[in-house]
């Protein structure tokens, strides 16, 4: 059953169109990698899926999803964020506060469980800014998990990580998808990772987008012709 259906979707920013008439769907338990050149609209799509940006045309239909966990790209300012690991993970529950001013016992328990699931419980009292890049990404992934058990939107989750931390992050995401059936939508420039882990690939480009299985993508012109524009 589809959790997200994008129908005839058109997106743009600053008055410039980045994609038009895009159609794809995401089912429960899917692992969709979104690839494409810079400026093709990948991050704009993430904002639209999160409800932070209205489409220029078409529609986004969500079924059975109350909350979406989001792991954004980090900048240098965010890497030095002055908070403990526990506080960062707990902030994933902000959307569930509603009119409440304080976190509940359930919120705090959820944060502890997410830290334990990702193996960072011993870091709970450490300052986020003192952690390595790989540890910080684990914390942000735990924060996204704390928001939801249904779907994760990950925008370049391995950006800036060394090879060992990159492999660790990909394995974590894959386990959450395979073992816990959490739906994953991940923006990436790493085509090899998309082919290794994803069940489907959405290639965004100026020409009609490609949307199919990872195996079909491997055999498509999008992948064959310099991994560039689609010529389907």
Regions found by a protein language model. Name each.
Residues 200-214:
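H-loop (His-switch) and adjacent beta-strand-loop-beta switch element
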Residues 127-131, 135:
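Conserved ABC ATPase signature
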Residues 152-155:
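Catalytic Walker B motif of ABC-type/P-loop ATPase nucleotide-binding domains
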Residues 163-165:
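Helix N-cap at the start of a conserved alpha-helix in ABC-type nucleotide-binding domains
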């Amino acid at each position: 059953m589809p959790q997200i259906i994008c129908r005839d979707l058109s997106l743009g920013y600053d008055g410039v169109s980045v994609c038009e008439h895009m159609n794809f769907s995401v089912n429960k338990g899917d692992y969709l990698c979104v690839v494409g050149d810079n400026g093709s609209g990948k991050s704009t799509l993430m904002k639209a899926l999160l409800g932070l940006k209205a489409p220029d045309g078409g529609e986004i239909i969500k079924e059975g999803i109350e909350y979406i966990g989001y792991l954004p790209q980090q900048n240098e300012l965010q890497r030095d964020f002055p908070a403990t690991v526990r506080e960062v993970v707990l902030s994933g529950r902000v959307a569930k506060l509603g009119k409440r001013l304080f976190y509940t016992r359930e919120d705090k328990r959820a944060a502890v469980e997410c830290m334990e699931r990702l193996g960072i419980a011993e870091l709970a009292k450490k300052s986020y800014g003192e952690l390595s890049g790989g540890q910080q990404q684990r914390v942000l992934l735990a924060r996204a998990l704390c928001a939801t058990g249904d779907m994760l939107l990950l925008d370049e989750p391995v950006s800036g990580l060394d090879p060992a931390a990159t492999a660790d992050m990909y394995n974590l995401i894959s386990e959450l998808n395979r073992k816990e059936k959490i739906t994953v939508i991940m923006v990436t420039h790493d085509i090899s990772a998309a082919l290794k882990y994803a069940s489907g690939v959405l290639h965004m480009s100026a020409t009609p987008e490609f949307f199919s299985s990872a195996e079909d993508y491997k055999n498509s012109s999008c992948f064959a012709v310099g991994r560039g524009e689609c010529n389907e």
